[in-house]
């Protein structure tokens, strides 16, 4: 009798909390299943039609989930999880959601065995810490001077995108862009605001290029015969309007004499001429005019005067471009004609309008006193391709940023997950009771990455994962799935590498989200 009393009684949850947990798990898993097919180089793409009727073609996890219409609060947690991974690492947004879905599936089995949710949550958290340590042990330290390693990481990121056939062109652009805006010896982070991706419809992705400094899609105004090429340019960015002043309130001015009308026109003409002369006197020969929603930023008469004074005009500069332009050209924004002075101008050897694949852009070359900025001119035959190329480039830039933050690479192809799963199983054998069962379940959850990679490549997932387990048990720590050849190989020899930070962040964020969902026992509607 006493023997029976010492056996721990299985956790019998109250009916409602159990239902809530299972409902949350089911909702979250449905989100993970929705994007599971888009993982890896052989993953499928999703076509999304937004509420406005726009069409998006992508296989980027964060983009898919951002546009997903999700109602269940637990499912929204997985959408937020993907967004958090995008902010932290910029890549691995699909993997993190798939991992969380797999962890929740294993947690559901443990709940049905009668293990308490808190025990599951805490065991998973410890297992995640053990997995991170295991991955750090197997990571390869790199230096930012090792351009080849940076290229391999950027190429691996691009290989799973729609634009994968252009990875040989886009990977060097991403690497060079990041290295141009940081000091590799001391940098610990990269501000991606210093790298501007300029989209221009036309041409093909092969025409994408890296431009040191500044490139604008807005073209020079030629309607009044203004110049399109200026050497030894003095650049001014103005935030006021070159058009006749208007009263702030709605007023009506009644003119009943043609001489008064003539006087008004003469005053307007003189007002604009004086403004243009002040600009010329300050030495500016290129002016960028910020877009105005109140009235015309520049009128035809002002353009005529500026053309006569041989001043190049580029209008419709967006508000969010101002900071980048100022940093790139060394100029300061000018809010009023009275504060127009030479010390607020930027200087460049050449500002010219060039034509590329039938489209015109303005390039600034030889900029003096410029901050560390670069522009990437992204080209594409249609809007869908162009936007996906921009997203892919952003992911590649984020991968290089990860390597600046944490200078270590890890093998891809499901290799680190299988290695960590094997190590967790060994660790679980040294433990007793429910924690050992939970850690075994966590190791099973990690195997979802190689399983999904194999399934998406059309391989036999059971056969591939069994071979991976066997190879890792025999000490082949870098054995992974070669999706291109459809076999298990030493993945390092195939140059399939990714930043350690991407994997670590994915494991930690997925485990935290699983823990949060496991701890929820009720959903209450607020008034």
Curated annotation (Swiss-Prot):
GO terms for biological process: protein folding. Its main location: cytoplasm. Molecular chaperone; assists the folding of proteins upon ATP hydrolysis. Known to play a role, in vitro, in the folding of actin and tubulin. GO terms for cellular component: chaperonin-containing T-complex; cytoskeleton; cytosol; nucleus. Heterooligomeric complex of about 850 to 900 kDa that forms two stacked rings, 12 to 16 nm in diameter. This is T-complex protein 1 subunit delta. It holds the Pfam family Cpn60_TCP1. The keyword Hydrolase does not apply. It comes from Schizosaccharomyces pombe (strain 972 / ATCC 24843) (Fission yeast). The keyword Membrane does not apply. InterPro entries: Chap_CCT_delta (IPR012717), Chaperone_TCP-1 (IPR017998), Chaperonin_TCP-1_CS (IPR002194), Cpn60/GroEL/TCP-1 (IPR002423), GroEL-like_apical_dom_sf (IPR027409), GROEL-like_equatorial_sf (IPR027413), TCP-1-like_intermed_sf (IPR027410), TCP-1_chaperonin (IPR053374). It is found in: Cytoplasm. Keywords: ATP-binding, Chaperone, Cytoplasm, Nucleotide-binding. It comes from the Eukaryota. GO terms for molecular function: ATP binding; ATP hydrolysis activity; ATP-dependent protein folding chaperone; unfolded protein binding. Belongs to the TCP-1 chaperonin family.
């Amino acid at each position: 009798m006493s023997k029976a009393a010492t056996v721990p009684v299985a956790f019998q949850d109250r009916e409602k909390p159990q239902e809530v947990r299972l409902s949350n798990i089911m909702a979250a898993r449905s989100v993970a299943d929705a994007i599971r097919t888009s993982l890896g180089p052989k993953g499928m793409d999703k076509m999304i039609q937004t509420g406005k009727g726009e069409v998006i073609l992508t296989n980027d996890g964060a983009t898919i989930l951002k546009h997903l219409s999700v109602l269940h609060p637990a499912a929204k947690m997985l959408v937020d999880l993907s967004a958090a991974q995008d902010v932290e690492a910029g890549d691995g947004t699909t993997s993190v959601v798939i991992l969380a879905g797999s962890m929740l599936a294993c947690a559901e089995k443990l709940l049905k065995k009668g293990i308490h949710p808190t025990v599951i949550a805490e065991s998973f958290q410890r297992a995640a810490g053990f997995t991170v340590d295991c991955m750090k042990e197997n990571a390869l330290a790199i230096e930012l001077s090792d351009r080849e390693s940076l290229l391999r990481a950027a190429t691996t990121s691009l290989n799973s995108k729609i634009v994968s056939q252009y990875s040989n062109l886009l990977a060097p652009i991403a690497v060079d862009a990041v290295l141009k805006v940081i000091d590799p010896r001391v940098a610990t982070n990269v501000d991606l605001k210093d790298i501007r991706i300029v989209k221009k419809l036309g041409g093909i992705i092969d025409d994408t290029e890296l431009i040191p400094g500044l490139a604008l899609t807005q073209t020079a105004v030629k309607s009044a015969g203004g110049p399109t090429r200026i050497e030894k340019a003095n650049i001014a960015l103005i935030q006021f309007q070159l058009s006749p002043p208007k009263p702030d309130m709605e007023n009506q001015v009644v003119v009943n004499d043609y001489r008064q009308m003539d006087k008004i026109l003469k005053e307007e003409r003189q007002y604009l001429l004086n403004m243009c002369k002040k600009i010329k006197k300050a030495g500016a020969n290129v002016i960028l005019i910020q877009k105005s929603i109140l009235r015309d930023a520049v009128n035809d008469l002002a353009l005529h005067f500026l053309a006569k004074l041989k001043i190049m005009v580029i209008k419709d500069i967006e508000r969010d471009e101002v900071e980048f332009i100022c940093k790139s050209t060394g100029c300061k924004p000018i809010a009023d004609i009275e504060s127009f002075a030479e010390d607020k101008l930027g200087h460049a050897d050449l500002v010219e309008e060039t034509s590329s694949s039938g489209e015109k852009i303005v390039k600034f070359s030889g900029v003096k006193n410029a901050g560390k900025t670069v522009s990437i001119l992204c080209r594409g035959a249609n809007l869908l391709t162009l936007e996906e190329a921009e997203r892919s480039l952003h992911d590649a830039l984020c991968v290089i940023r990860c390597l600046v933050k944490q200078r270590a690479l890890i093998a891809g192809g499901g290799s680190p997950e299988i290695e960590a799963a094997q190590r967790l199983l060994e660790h679980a054998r040294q433990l007793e009771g429910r924690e050992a069962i939970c850690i075994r379940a966590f190791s099973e959850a990690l195997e979802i990455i190689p399983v999904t990679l194999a399934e998406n490549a059309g391989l036999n997932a059971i056969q591939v994962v069994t071979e991976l387990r066997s190879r890792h048990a025999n000490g082949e720590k870098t054995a992974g799935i070669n999706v291109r050849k459809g076999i298990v190989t030493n993945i390092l020899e195939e140059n399939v590498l990714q930043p350690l930070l991407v994997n670590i962040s994915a494991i930690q964020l997925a485990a935290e989200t699983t823990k949060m969902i496991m701890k929820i026992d009720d959903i209450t509607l607020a008034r």
